Amino acid sequence: MALEVSLSARMQAVADMVSEGNRVCDVGCDHGYVSIYLVQQKRVPGVLAMDINKGPLARAAEHVEQAGLSEYITLRRSDGLTAYEPGEAQTLICAGMGGRLMQKILEREPLKTESFQEMILQPQSELAVFRKFLRNRGYSITLEDMILEEGKFLKKQSGGIIVTVE
């Protein structure tokens, strides 16, 4: 039986923000559940799932295999966007890491960052600093979400921020 995934409220909010039909690059994919969910729900045609660490990438590979989605989800070891080539995806997901790390990932590869049509960003910390970074770079925050997880409302930014790249 193929692996069926269900997402936490936080990760569901991130997945729900992806524009239907876009190919996705998931940086820091961890276990690969968001990538698997997006393909299983036929929301996206494919995902490039990347992580810097071997362990999480190996877990993601197991999950993708169990889900029978190897032809739709490409796994790649990458420090941020270093292994990404512009044009491989229209949507960037960067979720579950600190705002400063996320800023570093986006700043280090500006041409790659600017190649995305949308970025779905879910910083876990340093929200004010990260929002200032986005503002200073001229990004438009086009959608935010507030979610209830584990009995607590998480700040709007915890649900995700969609940034329109212009």
What positions do the PLM features span?
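Class I S-adenosyl-L-methionine
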Residues: 2-7, 88, 100-166
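Conserved alpha-helix/loop element of class I SAM-dependent methyltransferases that forms part
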Residues: 5-21
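Conserved class I S-adenosyl-L-methionine
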Residues: 21-30
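Glycine-rich SAM-binding Motif I of class I
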Residues: 32, 36
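Conserved SAM-binding motif I beta-strand of class I
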Residues: 46-51
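Conserved SAM/SAH-binding beta-strand->alpha-helix loop
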Residues: 53-55
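S-adenosyl-L-methionine
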Residues: 58-87
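Short SAM/SAH-binding signature in class I
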Residues: 88-96
